[in-house]
Amino acid sequence: MSLWYIIVAFVFFSTIIIVRNTRKTKKNLPPGPPRLPIIGNLHQLGSKPHSSMFKLSEKYGPLMALRFGSVSTVVASTPETVKEVLKTFDAECCSRPYMTYPARLTYNLKDIGFCPYTKYWREVRKMTVVELYTAKRVQSFQHTRKEEVASLVDFITQAASLEKPVNLNTKLMKLSGSVICRVVFGINLKGSKLENLYEEVIQGTMEVVGSFAAADYFPIIGRIIDRITGLHSKCEKIFKAMDAFFDQSIKHHLEDESIKDDIIDLLLKMERGEIELGEFQLTRDNTKGILFNILNAGIDTSAQVMTWVMTYLISNPRVMKKAQAEVREVIKNKDDIIEEDIERLEYLKMVVKETFRVLPLVPLLIPREASKDVKIGGYDIPKKTWIHVNIWAIHRNPNVWKDPEAFIPERFMDNQIDYKGLNFEFLPFGSGRRMCPGIGMGMALVHLTLINLLYRFDWKLPEGMEVEDVDLEESYGLVCPKKVPLQLIPVLTQWS
């Protein structure tokens, strides 16, 4: 009799499992390419996943299902599907999946960018908008930006007098880093003991975050793979360097009573409870996690934007000539260039927008995770599915943009398309709850720098190079830098 009960129980539970699996298979999942055992579709990503995903979406549709190892993923590639993800179902799709190395670098997700959608995240995000990135605060650091840009202009003037090429990748990265470190810590990095440590941290963290992490897709064995490839040890090394940089910078801030009203000052006040953060009080690890976001997002993105704008200008002489003519007409012989001048430079603003369109700096937004079952584009998206938003695909879609491969700033003439997340055909900074909160701070530096570079100097390619030789290829990462550094020769003019 006991055997009979065992058989009945076995049949009963087997039936339940079969019914559940049948229900799962009846879900209307998005279409996608065939998968290989174990690795799924990883072999189809190539060296530039944003480009590979775009090509796959042309065959399988605007919402496409992929599998990366053990991770189920969907990719949204058109304004319509992306609008559903970032607006219609933003609350259901704005959490983050756990990613091993970003978690380590953000002190176990005590940041804003990689933290899942929780009450803590909502409070910290609100704090950044209300306290850190207000228009008033951005304006308060205008003098710092002007000083650092003036220093860059002095360097370029010397290079021009010697007819020496300038590595704009390097100089614009240093400019961005100097501004951010003064704004955040009140520290002038030039010649300080922290300068070399800072450069190691910025370069290393972006490399780690932008690397393929096997641990995210293959439980257990993935960690072994990352140890073999060296990613694990590299992350640990960078984390220790970053932690030391934060500790020394905070110590310097606390010891120098003349430093005040910078961003770290605000965060330390929150640690002490002098500024309320809902029911939370920041710990030192919370502060460091937030600093990780501010430094990496603020420094790398601004520098890369400026580099790419200059790249596309030098490779399009017509556009360069038109942009410089506008800047010189508006500024005329005014010595004091101010950030507000950008409001009268309509063509330069179009050039910046077109650069964002041709090469969005974050071509694949940081993955989102569905916090519950949701239906997008008529398809079922199960809970815990990773959601990739392919901004690069939207910006290169011929159904959205005429001649998408061409660099034509005039396409933004006489329209209201902007990068503030309301136009789903143009989303360089994302949209919705996860939209970049520091746009104002970053773009203030970008505009001021470009105005100075175009007003004060003419630019030419190194000897032996033609316009056709300018390399327009990007390297892949969380942010896409130029694969080949941009070397240009500045030429002194009457405005220098």
UniProtKB/Swiss-Prot annotation:
This is Cytochrome P450 71B11. It comes from Arabidopsis thaliana (Mouse-ear cress). Pfam families: p450. It is found in: Membrane. The gene is CYP71B11. Keywords: Heme, Iron, Membrane, Metal-binding, Monooxygenase, Oxidoreductase, Transmembrane, Transmembrane helix. It is a single-pass membrane protein. The keyword Transmembrane applies. It comes from the Eukaryota. InterPro entries: Cyt_P450 (IPR001128), Cyt_P450_CS (IPR017972), Cyt_P450_E_grp-I (IPR002401), Cyt_P450_sf (IPR036396).
